[in-house]
């Protein structure tokens, strides 16, 4: 037997750690610190945008939520401050009360303005020291009818001027401006008179605008009657409306201007009470003057 062929080379020993995938018997855990090497010898790029998106989203969502919450709080504070400042100048919450009407109230109120002679109860109803809304009390003042009547008066005036070939935007604008100016002058004169007479009343400026604006209902009726039946119809209807508004104003304002005496349940006599009565009658008597002054030139 050949000596060279019978000689076997000793087996080659593999160096420790040459194969990272095979663990030694005494090693409890695999050593993965090196990590598998990707094919092609390329290593992962840690600056890849795909790995940064979750972190950016995690950081950006709290910031965006905080910004939205901060912005909404600023908006709510600004709205609250603006509402307070507006309410100081114009009592919006109180003005809403004067527009709380419905169709039934409007119909009954116009009927009361045209035919107030059969009405008995003129007291304004209260609920917990607060007057009820106009739609629940026909005696409560409102702004819906005066505003709509003023606008309708301007439209009817334009129609009357058009039938007489005198219509122009300038003339209609002057008509609206003069009517509004006279209304403001009337309200200011009443406020000054109440101040000079030192009347302790619950009448507000908005109440005076409402009561003095009711005369436009009669003015509209007079002008329409003049367009349909001529001057005769105009004078008859306007005279009826003037008497009705005088009666309505006396019965309504008497309770407002004499509210101090009515609250005490006694009839106050003397010079002060006479001034109050004269003031009530003067406010009522001036209504027909304005009704005629603002409508006579519209009927020919």
Swiss-Prot record:
Pfam families: YIF1. The keyword Transcription regulation does not apply. One of its GO terms (biological process) is protein transport. Keywords: Endoplasmic reticulum, Golgi apparatus, Membrane, Protein transport, Transmembrane, Transmembrane helix, Transport. It is found in: Endoplasmic reticulum membrane; Golgi apparatus membrane; Endoplasmic reticulum-Golgi intermediate compartment membrane. The chain crosses the membrane at residues 143-163, 179-199, 206-226, 228-248, 279-299. It is a multi-pass membrane protein. The keyword Ribosomal protein does not apply. GO terms for cellular component: COPII-coated ER to Golgi transport vesicle; endoplasmic reticulum; endoplasmic reticulum membrane; endoplasmic reticulum-Golgi intermediate compartment; endoplasmic reticulum-Golgi intermediate compartment membrane; Golgi apparatus; Golgi membrane. Residues 1-142, 200-205, 249-278 are cytoplasmic. Its main location: endoplasmic reticulum. Residues 164-178, 227, 300 are extracellular. Residues 1-46 are annotated as: Disordered. Involved in the anterograde traffic pathway from the endoplasmic reticulum to the plasma membrane and the organization of the Golgi architecture. Belongs to the YIF1 family. PANTHER family: PROTEIN YIF1B (PTHR14083:SF1), YIP1 INTERACTING FACTOR HOMOLOG YIF1 PROTEIN (PTHR14083). This is Protein YIF1B-A. It comes from Xenopus laevis (African clawed frog). The gene is yif1b-a.
